[in-house]
């Protein structure tokens, strides 16, 4: 990737396979690839790839005939412009491998104070959070609609054709455009083909619609906490006389790493009430999410914990991963 324009070929770099269908004028017709947090190949299929390639040829013919408007070329960006990536690769006469790019971009942003964790860590929001379940071999045909999209009127059999007015031809296109939506957005416009008609729906985005499991990404900038938790319901908070708007959460799993490294002394069933005295956040609904969003990897925090009806404080040391090839 040493001389590749990663500004033009912009994507979520934590993908196993990713294709760009483009022409000699560097006009990208469509993308093919993408994944979810469950598996690297959830949306990869030979039939859908064939459909994508056929659509690419169709769009190319339209472009040659002047029927497809030319898009503005993205600003160029090369690996040599990311100092920490250069230090890790080019300065050591090593290759810039694609899986290094996203992590070192985030390290560079962290150093520069421009890291937006909602945008840069929680990449490629999951379509199923919106209620979109695709018939993968058929590309963007909806197999089942639930949640927000069903409430808006999307039906099984619809073919998704645009997001916020931008044409999408593949899962890769749709995921890429969804990833570009501001995490503060409350709604998006989804266009679908239904028979011979085009329908547009206003989709109300669920709370924390951008959240995904980060485990497979192995971000260096993500504080590793080595426990899982679930948010308490409002009734559970009232029962324990806790802040109804707070992020109090019950520990559901403690990783063996925490026990081995003694990074914290949490137990399953503990309720984390606050972090460093803070019990409420505009975004986070659990203690672990609060730490990931508001603390730096490698920092130590003080937990306010409720255990068996008794309140206590304990330290928790987060860990920073060193990116491994």
Residue ranges of predicted features:
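Short Cys/His-rich "knuckle" micro-motifs
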Residues: 105-109
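Post-cleavage N-terminal segment of exported redox proteins
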Residues: 32-88
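The canonical Cys-X-X-Cys-His
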Residues: 91-102
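Thiol-based oxidoreductase modules, predominantly thioredoxin-like and allied folds used
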Residues: 1-4
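A short, hydrophobic beta-strand/beta-hairpin element that forms part of a small beta-sheet core
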Residues: 15-35
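PDZ/PDZ-like domain segments forming the peptide/carboxylate-binding groove
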Residues: 123-162, 166-169, 223-274, 278-281
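PDZ-domain C-terminal substructure recognizer with occasional recognition of PDZ-binding tails
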Residues: 161, 177-214, 264-267, 273, ...
